[in-house]
Amino acid sequence: MLISITEKCRMGCSHCMDDAKADCDKHMTEEIFRKAIDFNLKYDASITITGGEPTENPQFWKFMDILAEKISKKSFIAVTVCTNGMNFTNDDVYTIRALREKAGTKNLFLFQVTHVPKYYPIPIDMTLDIYKEPGVEIADKIKYLQYAGRAKNHPEWNFYNPTGPKCFNFRSMTRGGMNLTTAVTFLRNSGKFCTPQISWDGHIKVGETTLCPNVAYITDSESQILKKIREFKCSGCSHITNNMAAEYKEAIGE
């Protein structure tokens, strides 16, 4: 499950599926962050913090401390913070060490820094000590580029050709009768961590990009959320859904 704590990003990547911008002020508040973490932990043992660029949220490090404190009372929780690393300094090494210590040895607290010079226009000094720190992993490849957001304006990139929208698995499973925990656990065990998504304002989206429409809210009951998902319709990825077989369209109610 994704928690998007901001829609701001200054990197300006042309392949961005969210169309994140530097002048954006859409940041998750502490109140919503606490509710989002509680919601996530209720249904899923995996938490992925994202954005935009999550470190652009003015309360980023405070949020990480809140998160470490919350999971310290639990076991076998996996936290991944997805960042481009542009705001990290060597001083953050000590903060990351403290966060991982607070989270406890029974939990995983990982910072994943994705930096591929081909796609990321602002260079990062990868010789900094922070990028050698345990708990900070470097992703130097992007396996798939999605045809969404700002990326639609850049046909020079090679986009993968999906057989269905990113929301298909989650929507089809919940429409097929799975509850939220069963659906997200099945996805996690299949190596799929990016749906559903909690937006910066507390809304729930069934797709991966911040441009996906809102479906429900984190204070809704599970029965309300499932009902809204089952009744949900979206034409945002019509370039994909229009080419699906009839039985697959029926599986997500399109």
Tell where the protein language model's regions lie, with residue ranges.
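Accessory C-terminal segments flanking Radical SAM cores
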Residues: 158-254
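Short low-polarity hydrophobic stretches
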Residues: 5, 53, 110, 126, ...
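Flexible, charged surface loops at secondary-structure boundaries
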Residues: 40-42, 73, 104, 190, ...
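Short, solvent-exposed loop/turn segments at secondary-structure junctions
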Residues: 10, 54, 86-87, 116-118, ...
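Conserved AdoMet/S-adenosylmethionine-binding subsite of the radical SAM
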Residues: 57-186
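Conserved alpha-helical substructure of the radical SAM core
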Residues: 1-81, 88-92
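Short coil/turn linker and secondary-structure boundary residues
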Residues: 28, 88, 122, 219-220
